[in-house]
Amino acid sequence: RNNLQISFGQNPSGSSINLEAEWFEHLRLLYRQSFERLESQGRIEEASFVLAELLQANAEAVNFLSKHGKFRLAAELAEARNLPKENVVRQWFLAGEKMRAVRIAILHNCFEYAVTKLEQENAETGAELREVWAESLAESGNYSAAVDVIWKLEKRRDRAKDWIEKTIEFGGAASARMLARKTILYPEKFNEIKEKFQEIIHDDRFEAIENRNAFARAVLKQTINDELRTLLRPLTRKILSDALKTSQSLALKEFRELVVMAKDGALRTDLPAFPQLALPSGATECFELVIAESDKGASVIYDACSLPDGKIAVALGEAGIKVLSRYGKTIAFFDQPAQKLVVSDFSNKAISLIKRGETVRLARIDFVERRAAFWCDAKLNVYTPNFDGNLWFIGLKDDFYAIDANAKNFEAVWRVPEVGGEVYSAIRTNKQVKFLTLSAKGFETWWYELPTLILRSRNERKWLDNAAESFLHIANISEGGHSVVIMQEQIQESTDWRFYANIFDYEHLCRRFDFPLDTVRFNRPDTFTQYAVVVAYSEQQATDYLFFGSGNQIATFHLVKARNVSTKFNENYLTISDDCGRILIYDFQNRILQQNLRL
C-alpha cells in the first residue's frame, strides 16, 4: 500500500500464501504490535488501518475509532464491512447522521436503538419511527409485539385494533394479554369481550392457568376501567382456585395487587391463606411451561437479571440496557451496548459486556444512581457471572485474574499464571472462587478460598471414566460438589448421534438425563449452589431444563422459535430471557413463576 488508509469495501482476500500456522500467528503478533505502537503514538487512523486491513478485526477497528471520537469513519467502516446492523445504526447516531441511521433501521428492521434515541431527542420524530416499527412487526406476523410497541403512543392505539383481534383469534397466552388491552381500548364491546373472557375462566386445561395469569399480568400494567374491574372479580377467585392445584400461579404480591384493583372486599379477608397455597404441592412435581411461537415481544434480548423489588435489567445488544418495572414498564435506559450483564452481589451495580472482534467492550452500570459509563476494552475468554462490587474474576488463555472492578483501567490485583491448561469456566460465591481448566490431560478444578485467595484444592475430574464411546461436548462446575457434563454418543446400529447429561456429586455419577433426539446444540450449563439449568436447542425451540441436587428435574421451559437463550441465577430466582423478547423470572425455592413478560 502507498498509504495507511482504510478501504471501504469488504476485506480483500489477498494472495493465497501457504503459511504454517505458527508463521501465521507470528505475523499476526507483529501486526498487533504495530497497532499498539501506532496507538501509543496517537496515530489513530493508521492504527485502525492495521486492525481493519491487516488483522481484519473489523468490529474491533470500529470500536477503536469510536472510542477515539472518529465517529464518522467508524460508521462508514461498520457499514462497509457489513457489521451487525444494530452496530451500524448506533455508529451513525454517534456520528450525528440521524436520518441515515433511521433509514438503515427501517431497511434492516433493527428499530429499538433508533427509536429509543429519537424519543429522547425529539418525541414527535421518535413516535413516527415507533409507528413504522409496529407496522413492520405486524407485517411479519408478530401482532402481539406490534401492539406492545404502539401501545406507548396513546393517540395511535386505534391502529392496534386489527392486530389485537388477530392475536385474540389465534389463542394462547398472547391472546389473553390482548383481550385485557381490548377491554381498555374498546369498553363499548364489553359483551363480546366478556364472552371470550368466560372461555378463559372456564377452561380447565393445564395450559389455561398460564392464560389466566397472562390476562392478570396485562391488567397490572394498566390504568383500569369499570369494565375491566368487573372481569377481575371472577378472575381473582379463579386464580386463587388455581393456586390450590399447582405452583404455576401468580406471586402473592401480584395477587394482592389484583385483589385491590378488583375492589373485592370479601376476597381480601381470604388472602392470609394464599402463601400456603403457592408452595409446591410435592417435592417431585416438575413445573412445566410452554410458550407458543406467537407469544413473543418486539425486542431481541441478549441477557437479563432480576433486581430488587421486582425490577429487571435487560441487555439489548447495540440498543443498550433497560431497567423494567415488575410490570414491564421502562423506568431507566443506559446508552451502553451490552450482550451480557455481570451483576454485583447486592444487585446495585453491573458490568456490561459486548464482543468487539478479539476484544470485549466493558461498561459500568450503577442502578442506584442510574448512571452508566464506558470502562475499557479488554481481552478475556471466561468470567464469573457475578462479582462482589470490587473484585471480578476472569480467565484469559492459561491465566486466571482478579480484576479491580472500580479501577480506571483494566487492572489485575491478583493472578494465577500458567495453570496447565486453558481456563474453561469460572464461578464464585462470597466464600470461594473456582475455575475449571482444560488441557490434553483432561479437566481440572482449582478452588480458592475468599477473601484470603488461598488455594484449598486442585483436583482432576474423572468425568470420562467409564464413558465408553461417548464424547464430552460441554461442561460446567458449581461452587458445591455438583457438576453437569453434556455428552454425545452414537446411537447403536445407526449413524445418528444423541446427547445426554451426566450429573455428578463430586466424582459420583448421580444421574444420566437423555435429551430429545432432535437436540442439536447447548449453552454451557449454568449452576448455582445445588441448582443447574441446561439450555438445549432443536430446530423448533429452545428448552430449559432445571435440575436440583443430584439430578431431580424440577422445571422445564419450552421457548418455541427461540434461537438464543440466556439464563442467570441469583439467591432466589432463575431469570430466563430470549431473542423473542420473552422474560421469565422463576422462584426456584418455592417453585413459582414470578414474572412472565414480553418486551
Question: Which stretches of residues belong to each language-model region?
Answer:
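Structural signal for glycine-centered tight turns and loop->strand junctions in beta-sheet-rich domains
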Residues: 310, 328, 389, 431, ...
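Surface-exposed loop/turn elements that mediate protein-protein interactions on large endomembrane-trafficking
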Residues: 320-335, 359-378, 399-422, 442-468, ...
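Extended alpha-helical assembly domains of large eukaryotic scaffold proteins
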Residues: 1-299, 303-305, 313-315
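Beta-strand C-termini and the immediately following turn/loop, strongest in propeller blades
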Residues: 78, 105, 314-318, 352-358, ...
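Beta-strand-enriched, solvent-exposed domains that form extended recognition/catalytic surfaces
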Residues: 306-324, 329-331, 339-364, 386-389, ...
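A generic tandem-repeat structural signature
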Residues: 74-77, 83-120, 351-401
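Repeated scaffold domains used in trafficking and secretory/extracellular systems
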Residues: 296-305, 335-350, 376-391, 396, ...
